[in-house]
Amino acid sequence: MAGSSLRQVAVFGATGSIGASALDVIARHPERLRASVLSAGSKVEDLLALCAAHQPAHALIADAALYPALRDGLRALGLATQAHAGAEALDALAGSDACDTVVAAIVGAAGLPSTLAAARAGKRLLLANKESLVLAGELLTRTATAAGAEIIPIDSEHSAIFQCLRSCDAGRGVRRVILTASGGPFRGRDRAGLAAVTPAQAVAHPKWSMGPKISVDSATLMNKGLEVIEAHHLFGLPGEQIDVLVHPQSLVHSLVEFVDGSTLAQLGLPDMRTTLAVGLAWPERVESGVGGLDLLSQGRLDFEAPDTAAFPCLRLAWDALRAGGTAPAILNAANEVAVSAFLQGQVGFLAIPALVEHALTTLPRHNADTLDTLLFADAQARQITERALAHHALHA
């Protein structure tokens, strides 16, 4: 976009780890990128600090009760930034001319409405909120196509596939894609060795700096399962053409195998600023702040099959993808409730897949025709999982 006007970027989930990485890249390129909208859930002081640093036109706090604190804080800082609060205002900003690019980094199903609003408005959508695709992948991709919106994935694995496919024939001739997984902090442990895992251990990821929920998903391999479903929607591939390999070094982010026998892979240091720079500047390349990969110093690259017996969440995600309809929404919602309970010390680590499987096997699958249908399935899954927690059922 050399020679064009500033790209106006909305960073939803600005106080999280992905938001911080996005703002780091944006700040490196003031001549081409501007953080025009910043949002946060409830961390109003952190949001005010970001507003002081980046001076956006708009700032939003999702918790409406904190609106006065945001408004008064902006005034005290002498900023012209306009304060907003609540989900409806977030959706309105996503679809407004305040931005042409949206970094969708709100964790969980809460990020879906604003993501859909951005897609409906034809924005460039840098998608870090995997739940949007898992919960409503068909709806989101259909909406984006109809409005001319551009979805660029920010997950390192999907960004790798995106880059490999854009370098050749736009996806034709693909035999399979291979997502890589670090294996998380508990790689190599059996189920007995996972029973006593603590939340503090689960959020200590060996390679990536991530929020607590995503870190636990990585530890259970649910993160990789959700990425399998994402890849299905992003690249139009059936589950049979999507494989997973554990790669503990986290340097090869994904591979694409073509029908002619050739394979393309994307490599790089594990830093989200790389994929955000790809999304913000595509099809150009800009400095991200991440150094190059020195293969001589890195040494060996190892690959192994995932252990779905010890980590059944990956298998459950494939099951949900095959079932289709509302099954992925049920999977995602039950997982959110189970992970939250684990982080609060209510259940053990092995209860997470047990609770998810309980929801998948108990609730009926319906066609995912509308957002209302998907949100109803989401609510049902949360309810049945919370009921299981309340009755102390399935605690592992």
From Swiss-Prot:
Q: Which Pfam families match?
A: DXP_redisom_C, DXP_reductoisom, DXPR_C
Put simply, this protein is called 1-deoxy-D-xylulose 5-phosphate reductoisomerase
InterPro entries to which the protein is assigned, alphabetical: DXP_reductoisomerase, DXP_reductoisomerase_C, DXP_reductoisomerase_N, DXPR_C, DXPR_C_sf, NAD(P)-bd_dom_sf
Summarize where NADPH binds, as residue positions. T15, G16, S17, I18, G41, N129, E131, G211
Instruction: Spell out the family assignment given in the record's similarity comment.
Output: Belongs to the DXR family.
Which prosthetic group or cofactor does it need?
A: Mg(2+); Mn(2+)
Instruction: Provide the species name.
Output: Xanthomonas oryzae pv. oryzae (strain KACC10331 / KXO85)
PANTHER family, alphabetized: 1-DEOXY-D-XYLULOSE 5-PHOSPHATE REDUCTOISOMERASE, 1-DEOXY-D-XYLULOSE 5-PHOSPHATE REDUCTOISOMERASE, CHLOROPLASTIC
Question: Among its keywords, does the record have Cell cycle?
Answer: no
Known function: Catalyzes the NADPH-dependent rearrangement and reduction of 1-deoxy-D-xylulose-5-phosphate (DXP) to 2-C-methyl-D-erythritol 4-phosphate (MEP).
Instruction: Report residues binding 1-deoxy-D-xylulose 5-phosphate.
Output: K130, S156, E157, S182, H205, S218, N223, K224, E227
Q: Which cysteines are joined by disulfide bonds?
A: none
What reaction does this catalyse? 2-C-methyl-D-erythritol 4-phosphate + NADP(+) = 1-deoxy-D-xylulose 5-phosphate + NADPH + H(+)
Give the record's pathway: Isoprenoid biosynthesis; isopentenyl diphosphate biosynthesis via DXP pathway; isopentenyl diphosphate from 1-deoxy-D-xylulose 5-phosphate: step 1/6
Binding residues annotated for Mn(2+), in chain numbering: D155, E157, E227
